[in-house]
Amino acid sequence: LDVRQALGGRYVSVFRINCLALGWSAESRDHNSNSALEMLARLGMQPRTFDDYLETFPGVLDRLPGLHKVGLKNALAYDRSMNFDTLDIELARSAWGKPSPSPAEKKAFGDVVVDRLCRLAGERDIPFQMHLGTGLIRGSRPLEAAGLIERNPRTRFLLMHLAYPWSTELLGMAFVYRNIWIDLTWSWLLSPGTFPGRLREAIDILPDESRMMLGGDTWHAEEAYGAIGQVRRLIVETLESCVRQGQFRYQDAERLSRKILRDNARAFFRLP
């Protein structure tokens, strides 16, 4: 669970919540084969009921700083819809302990779990990342998550990948919901040809320049090196175009590039 045990003292990570949203039985696992009950057992927690299960969450979140984890990540777009509005606690309870709950029970279970985690994250000022766009494509557009974001105004949401192909929808939400930040991760790799236009739109729409940042989403060092080189070039080309057209000055472009590439993420995750 502690990334520094594997990679060294300069690293921090986020805690992926998928297995918790799918943790109705010992047999249930997320798409990476992670088991919630096995993970909780490693932390010394053995819930016997669904209510016990929910009561483990504050303890899990309170342990994150000691494990050098700086946020939560919801990548459930690979497992299910990103709509989390079925907050039926009784239906969620009925999923507990079943090897194969009904689709309605599974959704209610996950909805209650994710909503609870979002609330707890907001109370602790823990950022909450969400993968949007690709995955199970029919349920991964940004507006599917609007209810979750509205119910948790204290939670800082980082919505990833520019929600490609729904980038304009995502930017519209970020204009309305001031607890949304934008992660450009992977979006320029998916479509380098259209990325400059989407970046320009983000610059136009976002309420302030602190709300956009960058990640890599790569497996290997060589891939990360190539990806960061590509996005630096695309950002420079886009900002140079803004300067030529008189949208802002060269020093403004220089400041914005630093914020996108480093400063905004450091501030968002409260990094030193």
Feature locations, PLM:
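Active-site gating loops and adjacent loop-to-helix segments of metal-dependent hydrolytic enzymes
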Residues: Y11-G44, N83-A104, L234-T238
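A generic structural motif
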Residues: V14-N18, L184-W188, S210-G216, R249-R255
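Divalent metal-dependent hydrolysis catalytic cores, especially in the metallo-beta-lactamase
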Residues: L1-L20, V70-A77
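Short catalytic/ligand-binding loop motif for oxyanion handling, primarily in non-cytosolic enzymes
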Residues: D2-A6, A21-W24, D79-N83, L136-I137, ...
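Histidine/acidic residue-rich metal-binding segments in metalloenzymes
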Residues: T49-K73, S81-I180, T194-M213, V231, ...
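Active-site beta-loop-alpha junctions enriched in small/polar residues
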Residues: R16-L22, A75-D79, G133-G135, L162-P165, ...
